[in-house]
Amino acid sequence: MSLDIDQIALHQLIKRDEQTLDVVLRDSLLPTNAVVEEMMAELHRVYSAKSKAYGLFNEQSELADALKRSRKGDEDFLSFSRAATGRLRDELAKYPFAEGGVVLFCQYRYLAVEYLLISVLSSCHSMRVNEQLDLSTTHYLDINRADIVARIDLTEWETNPESTRYLTFLKGRVGRKVSDFFMDFLSAAEGLDTKAQNRGLLQAVDDYCADAELGKNERQAYRQQVYSYCNEQLQAGEEIALQALAQELPKLGEKNFQQFSAEQGYALEESFPADRGTLRQLTKFAGSGGGLSINFDALLLDERIFWDAATDTLTIKGTPPNLRDQLQRRAGSK
Protein backbone atom coordinates (compact mmCIF):
# COMPACT_ATOMS: atom_id res chain seq x y z
CA MET A 1 0.00 0.00 0.00
CA SER A 2 1.50 3.32 -1.11
CA LEU A 3 0.65 5.36 2.00
CA ASP A 4 3.15 8.01 3.09
CA ILE A 5 2.70 9.56 6.53
CA ASP A 6 3.65 13.22 6.76
CA GLN A 7 2.68 14.02 10.36
CA ILE A 8 0.77 12.16 13.05
CA ALA A 9 -0.30 13.17 16.55
CA LEU A 10 -2.04 11.24 19.32
CA HIS A 11 -3.89 12.65 22.32
CA GLN A 12 -6.36 11.11 24.73
CA LEU A 13 -9.76 11.81 26.25
CA ILE A 14 -10.39 10.13 29.60
CA LYS A 15 -13.85 9.90 31.15
CA ARG A 16 -13.39 10.30 34.92
CA ASP A 17 -17.08 10.26 35.83
CA GLU A 18 -20.47 11.18 34.36
CA GLN A 19 -19.62 14.89 34.33
CA THR A 20 -15.87 14.97 33.70
CA LEU A 21 -13.96 14.33 30.49
CA ASP A 22 -10.25 15.02 30.87
CA VAL A 23 -7.80 15.57 28.05
CA VAL A 24 -4.20 14.31 27.95
CA LEU A 25 -2.04 15.98 25.28
CA ARG A 26 1.24 14.72 23.83
CA ASP A 27 4.15 17.15 23.80
CA SER A 28 5.52 15.87 20.51
CA LEU A 29 4.43 14.28 17.27
CA LEU A 30 4.37 10.50 17.07
CA PRO A 31 7.56 9.22 15.39
CA THR A 32 6.83 7.45 12.12
CA ASN A 33 8.01 3.86 12.30
CA ALA A 34 6.89 0.45 11.03
CA VAL A 35 4.27 0.05 13.79
CA VAL A 36 2.76 3.47 13.09
CA GLU A 37 2.74 2.82 9.35
CA GLU A 38 1.00 -0.52 9.87
CA MET A 39 -1.63 1.09 12.12
CA MET A 40 -2.38 3.85 9.60
CA ALA A 41 -2.51 1.40 6.70
CA GLU A 42 -5.10 -0.62 8.62
CA LEU A 43 -7.12 2.46 9.59
CA HIS A 44 -7.04 3.69 5.99
CA ARG A 45 -8.17 0.28 4.74
CA VAL A 46 -11.01 -0.02 7.26
CA TYR A 47 -12.22 3.52 6.63
CA SER A 48 -12.08 3.20 2.85
CA ALA A 49 -14.20 0.03 2.97
CA LYS A 50 -17.03 1.61 4.96
CA SER A 51 -20.02 3.53 3.64
CA LYS A 52 -19.44 7.25 4.09
CA ALA A 53 -21.36 10.50 3.96
CA TYR A 54 -19.97 13.62 2.32
CA GLY A 55 -19.69 17.11 3.69
CA LEU A 56 -18.07 20.53 3.55
CA PHE A 57 -16.93 23.09 6.09
CA ASN A 58 -19.25 25.86 7.22
CA GLU A 59 -18.01 29.38 6.55
CA GLN A 60 -17.33 29.97 10.27
CA SER A 61 -15.57 26.65 10.92
CA GLU A 62 -12.85 27.13 13.55
CA LEU A 63 -11.24 23.86 12.58
CA ALA A 64 -11.06 24.88 8.91
CA ASP A 65 -9.48 28.22 9.85
CA ALA A 66 -6.94 26.52 12.11
CA LEU A 67 -6.18 23.95 9.41
CA LYS A 68 -5.57 26.72 6.87
CA ARG A 69 -3.10 28.37 9.27
CA SER A 70 -1.34 25.06 9.75
CA ARG A 71 -1.15 24.43 6.02
CA LYS A 72 0.35 27.90 5.50
CA GLY A 73 2.95 27.27 8.19
CA ASP A 74 1.56 29.86 10.61
CA GLU A 75 0.89 27.12 13.17
CA ASP A 76 2.66 23.77 13.51
CA PHE A 77 0.73 20.51 13.21
CA LEU A 78 1.18 19.54 16.86
CA SER A 79 -0.28 22.85 18.09
CA PHE A 80 -3.15 22.47 15.64
CA SER A 81 -3.93 18.96 16.91
CA ARG A 82 -3.67 19.97 20.60
CA ALA A 83 -6.08 22.89 20.18
CA ALA A 84 -8.47 20.77 18.10
CA THR A 85 -8.50 18.05 20.77
CA GLY A 86 -9.51 20.64 23.36
CA ARG A 87 -12.40 21.78 21.17
CA LEU A 88 -13.40 18.15 20.61
CA ARG A 89 -13.48 17.56 24.37
CA ASP A 90 -15.69 20.61 24.87
CA GLU A 91 -18.09 19.45 22.15
CA LEU A 92 -18.17 15.81 23.21
CA ALA A 93 -18.85 16.72 26.85
CA LYS A 94 -22.26 18.11 25.80
CA TYR A 95 -23.55 14.64 24.92
CA PRO A 96 -24.78 11.99 27.38
CA PHE A 97 -23.07 9.15 25.48
CA ALA A 98 -19.65 10.83 25.80
CA GLU A 99 -16.85 8.31 26.13
CA GLY A 100 -13.10 8.65 26.16
CA GLY A 101 -10.67 7.41 23.57
CA VAL A 102 -7.45 8.02 21.70
CA VAL A 103 -7.72 11.07 19.44
CA LEU A 104 -5.70 10.66 16.26
CA PHE A 105 -4.71 13.31 13.72
CA CYS A 106 -2.78 12.07 10.71
CA GLN A 107 -1.74 13.94 7.60
CA TYR A 108 -0.77 11.47 4.89
CA ARG A 109 -0.59 10.95 1.16
CA TYR A 110 -2.16 8.08 -0.75
CA LEU A 111 -2.02 7.75 -4.55
CA ALA A 112 -0.98 11.40 -5.02
CA VAL A 113 -3.86 12.67 -2.86
CA GLU A 114 -3.16 14.38 0.47
CA TYR A 115 -5.50 13.65 3.38
CA LEU A 116 -6.05 14.65 6.98
CA LEU A 117 -7.73 11.90 8.98
CA ILE A 118 -9.21 12.61 12.41
CA SER A 119 -10.54 9.81 14.59
CA VAL A 120 -11.48 8.89 18.14
CA LEU A 121 -10.41 5.29 18.68
CA SER A 122 -11.62 3.10 21.53
CA SER A 123 -9.30 0.83 23.49
CA CYS A 124 -10.32 -2.76 24.17
CA HIS A 125 -9.04 -5.07 26.87
CA SER A 126 -8.00 -8.64 26.11
CA MET A 127 -5.71 -11.43 27.29
CA ARG A 128 -2.32 -12.50 25.99
CA VAL A 129 -0.01 -15.46 26.53
CA ASN A 130 3.73 -14.74 26.70
CA GLU A 131 6.64 -17.00 25.73
CA GLN A 132 6.59 -18.58 29.19
CA LEU A 133 2.90 -19.38 28.68
CA ASP A 134 1.89 -16.95 31.41
CA LEU A 135 -1.38 -15.11 31.03
CA SER A 136 -1.63 -11.34 31.32
CA THR A 137 -3.98 -8.55 30.36
CA THR A 138 -3.41 -6.25 27.41
CA HIS A 139 -5.32 -3.60 25.54
CA TYR A 140 -5.42 -2.57 21.89
CA LEU A 141 -6.95 0.04 19.60
CA ASP A 142 -10.23 -1.23 18.17
CA ILE A 143 -9.59 -0.03 14.62
CA ASN A 144 -11.95 -2.48 12.90
CA ARG A 145 -14.96 -1.02 14.73
CA ALA A 146 -13.92 2.62 14.53
CA ASP A 147 -17.02 4.74 13.90
CA ILE A 148 -15.91 8.24 14.91
CA VAL A 149 -13.80 9.09 11.89
CA ALA A 150 -13.65 11.96 9.42
CA ARG A 151 -11.25 12.51 6.55
CA ILE A 152 -10.51 15.70 4.67
CA ASP A 153 -9.25 15.46 1.11
CA LEU A 154 -6.76 18.31 1.39
CA THR A 155 -5.97 18.19 -2.32
CA GLU A 156 -9.64 18.59 -3.28
CA TRP A 157 -10.29 21.21 -0.58
CA GLU A 158 -7.41 23.43 -1.66
CA THR A 159 -7.81 23.06 -5.43
CA ASN A 160 -11.62 23.07 -5.55
CA PRO A 161 -12.99 24.93 -2.49
CA GLU A 162 -16.52 24.95 -3.95
CA SER A 163 -16.64 21.15 -3.82
CA THR A 164 -19.34 19.52 -1.67
CA ARG A 165 -17.43 16.30 -1.13
CA TYR A 166 -13.92 17.00 0.14
CA LEU A 167 -14.91 15.93 3.66
CA THR A 168 -16.14 12.42 4.40
CA PHE A 169 -17.34 10.91 7.65
CA LEU A 170 -18.98 7.78 8.98
CA LYS A 171 -22.64 7.75 9.92
CA GLY A 172 -23.27 6.96 13.57
CA ARG A 173 -25.26 4.35 15.41
CA VAL A 174 -29.04 3.98 15.57
CA GLY A 175 -30.80 6.76 17.47
CA ARG A 176 -28.92 9.96 18.24
CA LYS A 177 -26.12 9.85 15.71
CA VAL A 178 -22.60 9.65 17.06
CA SER A 179 -21.61 11.65 14.00
CA ASP A 180 -23.67 14.65 15.20
CA PHE A 181 -21.12 15.86 17.73
CA PHE A 182 -18.28 15.19 15.28
CA MET A 183 -19.95 17.36 12.65
CA ASP A 184 -20.41 20.08 15.27
CA PHE A 185 -16.73 19.79 16.18
CA LEU A 186 -15.74 20.05 12.51
CA SER A 187 -18.33 22.81 12.01
CA ALA A 188 -19.34 21.07 8.81
CA ALA A 189 -22.55 20.35 6.92
CA GLU A 190 -23.55 17.38 4.80
CA GLY A 191 -22.71 17.84 1.15
CA LEU A 192 -23.15 15.45 -1.77
CA ASP A 193 -26.10 13.10 -1.18
CA THR A 194 -24.89 9.82 -2.65
CA LYS A 195 -28.21 8.03 -2.15
CA ALA A 196 -30.03 10.82 -4.00
CA GLN A 197 -27.51 10.58 -6.85
CA ASN A 198 -28.02 6.82 -7.11
CA ARG A 199 -31.82 7.19 -6.97
CA GLY A 200 -31.58 9.80 -9.73
CA LEU A 201 -29.53 7.37 -11.81
CA LEU A 202 -32.18 4.66 -11.42
CA GLN A 203 -34.92 7.08 -12.45
CA ALA A 204 -32.91 8.20 -15.47
CA VAL A 205 -32.39 4.58 -16.55
CA ASP A 206 -36.12 3.81 -16.26
CA ASP A 207 -37.08 6.96 -18.16
CA TYR A 208 -34.48 6.29 -20.86
CA CYS A 209 -35.87 2.79 -21.40
CA ALA A 210 -39.45 4.10 -21.41
CA ASP A 211 -38.53 6.82 -23.92
CA ALA A 212 -37.12 4.12 -26.22
CA GLU A 213 -40.31 2.05 -25.72
CA LEU A 214 -38.39 -1.07 -24.73
CA GLY A 215 -40.27 -4.23 -23.85
CA LYS A 216 -40.16 -5.76 -20.38
CA ASN A 217 -37.28 -8.16 -21.04
CA GLU A 218 -35.31 -5.51 -22.93
CA ARG A 219 -35.76 -3.04 -20.06
CA GLN A 220 -34.56 -5.57 -17.52
CA ALA A 221 -31.58 -6.52 -19.67
CA TYR A 222 -30.67 -2.83 -19.88
CA ARG A 223 -30.97 -2.44 -16.10
CA GLN A 224 -28.73 -5.49 -15.69
CA GLN A 225 -26.07 -3.86 -17.86
CA VAL A 226 -26.22 -0.71 -15.75
CA TYR A 227 -25.97 -2.78 -12.57
CA SER A 228 -23.00 -4.77 -13.87
CA TYR A 229 -21.01 -1.60 -14.58
CA CYS A 230 -21.95 0.04 -11.27
CA ASN A 231 -21.20 -3.09 -9.27
CA GLU A 232 -17.78 -3.41 -10.90
CA GLN A 233 -17.04 0.19 -9.90
CA LEU A 234 -18.24 -0.51 -6.38
CA GLN A 235 -16.06 -3.60 -6.04
CA ALA A 236 -13.05 -1.71 -7.35
CA GLY A 237 -13.63 1.19 -4.97
CA GLU A 238 -14.23 3.53 -7.91
CA GLU A 239 -17.03 5.97 -8.59
CA ILE A 240 -19.79 5.74 -11.20
CA ALA A 241 -18.78 7.91 -14.15
CA LEU A 242 -21.68 8.86 -16.42
CA GLN A 243 -19.51 9.15 -19.52
CA ALA A 244 -17.98 5.71 -18.99
CA LEU A 245 -21.40 4.23 -18.19
CA ALA A 246 -22.86 5.69 -21.40
CA GLN A 247 -20.02 4.11 -23.38
CA GLU A 248 -20.80 0.72 -21.82
CA LEU A 249 -24.49 0.91 -22.74
CA PRO A 250 -26.04 0.53 -26.20
CA LYS A 251 -27.43 3.77 -27.57
CA LEU A 252 -31.22 3.99 -27.60
CA GLY A 253 -32.48 6.38 -30.24
CA GLU A 254 -30.54 9.51 -31.21
CA LYS A 255 -29.06 10.26 -27.77
CA ASN A 256 -26.81 8.16 -25.59
CA PHE A 257 -27.59 7.77 -21.90
CA GLN A 258 -25.38 10.65 -20.76
CA GLN A 259 -26.91 13.07 -23.26
CA PHE A 260 -30.43 12.00 -22.29
CA SER A 261 -29.85 12.39 -18.55
CA ALA A 262 -28.24 15.81 -19.02
CA GLU A 263 -31.14 17.12 -21.12
CA GLN A 264 -33.81 15.77 -18.76
CA GLY A 265 -32.35 17.59 -15.75
CA TYR A 266 -31.69 14.78 -13.27
CA ALA A 267 -28.93 16.89 -11.67
CA LEU A 268 -26.49 14.00 -11.72
CA GLU A 269 -22.81 14.67 -11.04
CA GLU A 270 -20.32 13.63 -13.71
CA SER A 271 -19.16 11.01 -11.23
CA PHE A 272 -20.41 9.93 -7.81
CA PRO A 273 -19.96 7.02 -5.36
CA ALA A 274 -22.07 3.91 -5.81
CA ASP A 275 -24.64 3.05 -3.14
CA ARG A 276 -25.02 -0.71 -2.89
CA GLY A 277 -28.54 -0.76 -1.42
CA THR A 278 -29.97 1.64 -4.00
CA LEU A 279 -28.31 -0.04 -6.98
CA ARG A 280 -29.69 -3.41 -5.93
CA GLN A 281 -33.10 -2.12 -6.99
CA LEU A 282 -31.97 -2.39 -10.62
CA THR A 283 -32.18 -6.17 -10.44
CA LYS A 284 -34.24 -7.01 -7.35
CA PHE A 285 -37.37 -6.12 -5.42
CA ALA A 286 -36.97 -6.16 -1.66
CA GLY A 287 -38.88 -4.98 1.38
CA SER A 288 -39.67 -5.83 4.96
CA GLY A 289 -42.09 -4.85 7.68
CA GLY A 290 -44.75 -6.25 9.95
CA GLY A 291 -42.86 -9.51 10.41
CA LEU A 292 -42.55 -10.04 6.65
CA SER A 293 -39.38 -9.92 4.57
CA ILE A 294 -39.49 -10.37 0.78
CA ASN A 295 -36.64 -10.36 -1.75
CA PHE A 296 -36.87 -11.57 -5.35
CA ASP A 297 -35.30 -11.06 -8.77
CA ALA A 298 -37.01 -8.39 -10.84
CA LEU A 299 -37.38 -10.84 -13.75
CA LEU A 300 -39.86 -12.88 -11.69
CA LEU A 301 -42.41 -10.08 -11.56
CA ASP A 302 -45.38 -10.97 -13.78
CA GLU A 303 -43.77 -14.38 -14.39
CA ARG A 304 -44.02 -16.21 -11.07
CA ILE A 305 -44.84 -13.29 -8.80
CA PHE A 306 -47.85 -11.06 -9.42
CA TRP A 307 -48.87 -7.86 -7.69
CA ASP A 308 -52.49 -6.67 -7.62
CA ALA A 309 -52.28 -2.93 -6.95
CA ALA A 310 -56.01 -2.62 -6.23
CA THR A 311 -55.90 -5.06 -3.31
CA ASP A 312 -52.17 -4.70 -2.52
CA THR A 313 -51.83 -8.47 -2.85
CA LEU A 314 -48.70 -10.35 -3.88
CA THR A 315 -49.25 -13.81 -5.40
CA ILE A 316 -46.33 -16.24 -5.57
CA LYS A 317 -46.52 -19.26 -7.87
CA GLY A 318 -44.03 -21.92 -6.85
CA THR A 319 -42.31 -21.52 -3.50
CA PRO A 320 -38.61 -22.20 -2.83
CA PRO A 321 -38.04 -25.86 -1.80
CA ASN A 322 -36.70 -25.03 1.67
CA LEU A 323 -39.67 -22.75 2.37
CA ARG A 324 -42.10 -25.34 1.02
CA ASP A 325 -40.56 -27.99 3.26
CA GLN A 326 -41.03 -25.79 6.34
CA LEU A 327 -44.64 -25.07 5.40
CA GLN A 328 -45.38 -28.76 4.85
CA ARG A 329 -43.85 -29.75 8.19
CA ARG A 330 -45.79 -27.05 9.99
CA ALA A 331 -49.04 -28.09 8.25
CA GLY A 332 -48.42 -31.74 9.14
CA SER A 333 -47.96 -30.96 12.83
CA LYS A 334 -51.43 -29.43 13.20
From Swiss-Prot:
- Using the UniProt record, give the first listed, main subcellular location: cytoplasm
Q: What parts of the sequence cross the membrane?
A: none
Keyword set, alphabetical order = Cytoplasm
Q: Does the keyword Hydrolase apply?
A: no
Gene Ontology molecular function terms on file: double-stranded DNA binding; single-stranded RNA binding
Disulphide bonds in the chain: none
Q: Which domain of life is it from?
A: Bacteria
Q: Does the keyword Protein biosynthesis apply?
A: no
Q: Where in the cell is it found?
A: Cytoplasm, Nucleoid
InterPro entries referenced in this protein's UniProt entry, alphabetically: Nucleoid_associated_NdpA
Q: Might you report a single GO cellular component term?
A: cytoplasm
Q: Which family does it belong to?
A: Belongs to the YejK family.
| Name by which UniProt lists this protein | Nucleoid-associated protein YPK_2796
Give the organism the record lists. Answer: Yersinia pseudotuberculosis serotype O:3 (strain YPIII)
